[in-house]
Amino acid sequence: TLRRSSAASDVYKRQDLIRAQLTGEIILKEMDQVKTETIKDKSLNERAYGDLTGMNKDEARAKFGNDQVHIWRRSYDISPPGGESLKDTHDRVVPFFKEHIEPEISSKNILIAAHGNSLRALVKHLEDISEQEIVQLEIATGVPIIYKFSDGSYAKQ
């Protein structure tokens, strides 16, 4: 998909976590762009799950209850104990995007490799999605999302 789109990357921005790093490296290798400038920043890291960290969904449900875990996972502004809500993630990801990506977007193609909630936060910003809609949005793992920037707005390709 990316190769066919001719979306060659001039800059590669990634989070600090290994899985997204490896995904980005695979993409660059497949596109014959392994020498692309790489910038790592924890602002793109996955949502922090606090006390849920290290638990799978079943373990979290057993400890905190199915309804509570569902609220934490699918609410926009309710965070698990010691963790971040999707709003918190949005409030971390979007300023990074505005400061470090938007200034380059009109002259460069930028690859961003990150986890689902960081990407959902970014999609909310790019597509101006409501809080109610964004909590329903699923980001498929390993499936590229391509946006074209033109005339001050982003269009999903």
Protein language model features and the residues they cover:
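Phosphate-handling substructures
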Residues: I27-V94, E138, K148
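Single conserved hydrophobic/aromatic residue that forms the stacking wall/gate
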Residues: T1-A8, Y12
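Active-site-adjacent alpha-helix immediately C-terminal to a catalytic or transition-state-stabilizing loop
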Residues: Q21-L22, D32-K35, P95-Y154
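Short glycine-rich phosphate-binding loop at a beta-alpha junction
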Residues: D10-D16, N109-A113
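Catalytic metal-binding/acid-base residues of hydrolase active sites
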Residues: I18, L44, N117
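Small-residue (primarily alanine) positions within well-ordered alpha-helices
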Residues: A7-A8, A20-G24
